[in-house]
Amino acid sequence: MTYVISDLHGYPIEKLKMLLEKANFGEDDFLYILGDVIDRNGDGGVGILRWLLSQPNVQLILGNHEAMLLSCEFLFDEITDDSIADFDSEKIEILSNYQLNGGDVTLKSLAKLNKESPETVADILDYLRDCPLYEAVTAGGKDYFLCHSGIDEFEKGKKISDYPADAFIWAWPELDDEYFDLSLIHI
């Protein structure tokens, strides 16, 4: 069976595991998480990210919160004269925006983990960099296009590959917005 969930925002990993257990989620099933497992609550989703590293039947699709974290990965660089010189007003603005969107709790959890296991933080950042922006899947005989937010400024006939990354993570669609018949998608 295929499962889809989104916007966990720091939901405790223990509760997510309990939810999956109640749904009888097993190794023959597949879970898509439509972004935003991090920020705002608890450990900032770091527990979920660590769990994701070892889950072959779970795929995180990049959300805007993961994208904001990746835009702040300069925080995990070694501190050198060059990195200090490169810390400019643009980076301060990027960090400030992320903090305003609930990123503090995630940054604090990752900073703590970085002291204990910098390799794990590097693995998490690598994992996030490799997350897809979307997936086309078939479940129950129906085709679905999965992404975090819809498709910003959608145009019928436009190839999916012609949209910028932000189109899949920053859109604010209405519930009744229709995009396309999946059989007509040109990826």
Identify what each model region corresponds to.
Residues 58-115:
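A basic- and aromatic-enriched beta-loop-alpha substructure that forms the phosphate/nucleotide-
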Residues 42-44, 70-72, 156-157:
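Short glycine-/acidic-enriched loop or helix-start segments at secondary-structure transitions
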Residues 9-10, 39, 66-67, 150-154:
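Short, solvent-exposed loop/turn segments at secondary-structure junctions
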Residues 49-53, 125:
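Short amphipathic alpha-helical segments and helix-helix/interface helices
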Residues 7, 36, 63-64, 106, ...:
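Divalent metal-coordination and catalytic microenvironments
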Residues 1-49, 186:
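N-terminal active-site segment of His-dependent metallophosphoesterases
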Residues 100-185:
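Acidic, His/Gly-enriched loop-helix segments that form or flank divalent-metal centers
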Residues 1, 26-28, 55-57, 141-142, ...:
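A general structural motif
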